Amino acid sequence: DYGVLEDAVHRLMTDLTRKLHELRPDVLIEFRQNYIGPVMRQYGNMFRVGDCPYSTSYNRVGIVDLRLTSGRTAVHSDMLMWNPEDRVENAACQIENVLFANVQLSARLDRIPEEHLRMMRFWTRLMQDEQHLLQEAPLYAEQPQMLYPVVRTEEKGRSVIACYQHGVLAEVPASRLDDVYLINANSGSTMLARFDQKARWKATVWNCLGEIQTEEEWEPEGLVEWKIPECGMVRLQKVR
């Protein structure tokens, strides 16, 4: 018997976790917000955002909060669903808001239009190709009082910067980056970025379907604004 509830709960969870791992060493144990915190990492190996149907901002904030407090524990989004008749840009916005976590797609693939499927293939392929940069590289999030309008990861000269509100500024430290994804994850058609030094880049712009819009060399300096499709993306690769 235990005289303190917290000690009893700890013993219960420890015993359960140990027994489950004995039965299956690769068992997956998931906890969902708000029953989580750094101490819960010793009991589970997946943390998931709480229920937030069709709430892109709640999903994003939940993911960032988990990423910043969960170490290397896997972080999962809440499931994604949308109206098949919705604009493809709105559907893309849902996926873009969970780029920095393991996405849980629950949209019925047999009920959504081909345009939505093309969009999903593009973004899920990016998440697979850049899994380490998106989910394991150090994550930085700005202005929690504004629900993290800019979120980025950066490691070894590469970065992903996602802007979730139109008009927010993306800081691009060109002095230390060679490869940058800038994601316009909002309803605007322009992006603002500030480069800390002049450099020459190959700039490839995609719309949310993964269709290339422009591909050119570019030499931005200081504060710049340029056209990026709604929920589209530009990749900047430094030219040597």
Q: What residue ranges belong to the model's regions?
A:
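The substrate-binding groove and active-site-proximal loops of carbohydrate-active enzymes
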Residues: 1-9, 82
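Intrinsic low-complexity, polar/charged intrinsically disordered segments
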Residues: 235-238
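Tight coil/turn sites that cap or link beta-strands
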Residues: 229-233
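Active-site-proximal substrate-binding groove within the catalytic cores of carbohydrate-active enzymes
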Residues: 12-228
